[in-house]
């Protein structure tokens, strides 16, 4: 549904960007995504490499980044783009991958796993993300202009490991149905976070085992 992404990610984003321009807001942080890299052949993906989105969602995020870059250039705005890599954690959207997994494993519902579970993701715990954003907001002076960061742990985890981790915590087995690879899906995400660590001095990323346990305990899924 390309129109849905255009209405939300492009038109909605443009409305906010215009408000930032008109109100002369000092710092504008916006959400981008690891999907801008598409199925990269080079890992870990760096902020400076060529972007090749594989789906409409990723394409809209590239458009937003370029829009922010031009607004920064022509209207002297300070825009900071955050390329989030598979953020998960307590109180997450129920339609996202990990919350759906937790719910379906708990109630023994059928889980559709694409590409035989061979996907790999750079999972980033939500509390880490909150701390990073706080540090970035506090750090940057008014002269930042436009800058982009990979917001990622820098660690790659196989989807099957996530499933096994949830099974272990909940002490339940999953009901898996393996399906073929979906169009536009990325086989792997793995970001380089050197720039992020340098500018925030944040290095204590939550590992997937701890993140899953905290998510389940805080959401009282057991």
Predicted regions located by residue number:
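Active-site Tyr-X3-Lys motif and surrounding loop/helix of classical short-chain dehydrogenase/reductase
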Residues: 1-7, 52
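NAD(P)-dependent short-chain dehydrogenase/reductase
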Residues: 43, 54, 66-137, 163-169
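C-terminal substrate-binding subdomain of Rossmann-fold SDR/epimerase-dehydratase oxidoreductases
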Residues: 105-222
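Structural element of the ATP-grasp superfamily
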Residues: 16, 68, 101, 196-197
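Active-site helix of classical SDR
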Residues: 56-63
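Structural signature of beta-strand start/N-cap positions in the alpha/beta core
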Residues: 26-27, 78-80, 147
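Conserved Rossmann-fold NAD(P)-dependent oxidoreductase catalytic core, especially the SDR/UDP-sugar
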Residues: 14-56
